[in-house]
Amino acid sequence: MRNIKLLIEYEGTNYHGWQVQPNGLTIQEVIEEKIAVMTGQRVRLTASGRTDAGVHALGQVANFQTSSQIPTEGFWRGLNSLLPPDIIIKSAAEMDPGFHAQFGVKRKTYCYWILNREPPSAIYRNYSWHFPLPLNQRAMQDAAGNLLGKKDFSSFRAAHPDTTDPVREVFKAEWSAKKPSFFCFTVEADGFLKHMVRNLVGTLVEVGKGKISGEGFKQIIKARDRRKAGVTAPPQGLFLVGVEY
């Protein structure tokens, strides 16, 4: 059997996330169906991680096993001819049998976009969180610096977590202005808890509003209690940028 790795870009607006679900169209389901059309085989795609409904990816990685002899270039070209325009295979590569898109991850990078101005955007409404009130970006950046290092991130996990270990190591947590009224929170870590990035953003926005102080943000991290943190930011501003192995 061959082990094929795919690098995938997708707009998550029209999907119920990555993982196959009984009551909603997902990205995994669509790609698996097109692989079956090409190879005549049903395969199981394993991704670096699951993205929620409405979340986007610039560099999702997934792998599958197949006995098909289609060249790797044929996989990405063929799949792109079959897939809808909001899902793109950027590349395909044949990997060693031991490669696993989920368990081999060393680092992941996410970016969360905020549109910080009073009027919303017709163009960017599916790619950013429109927040019309003023935000103190410097205060948000100072607070984000407290995320660096290996910590228990229980305060920022989902109400119904999908793992028992809440400890993750964050290598980068940075706010940056990209264009007028837009800024981005880039966070890089060895892994992320369910809803972790969106919960971090929601809490940091409270810092930017002046509702939570820098010291208060530190205490939220130490509390290890989801109830102490801010709201979950909406999904459409979140992008999985890349995965390192």
Predicted regions mapped to residue ranges:
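Structured-RNA-binding interfaces characteristic of tRNA pseudouridine synthases
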Residues: M1-Y245
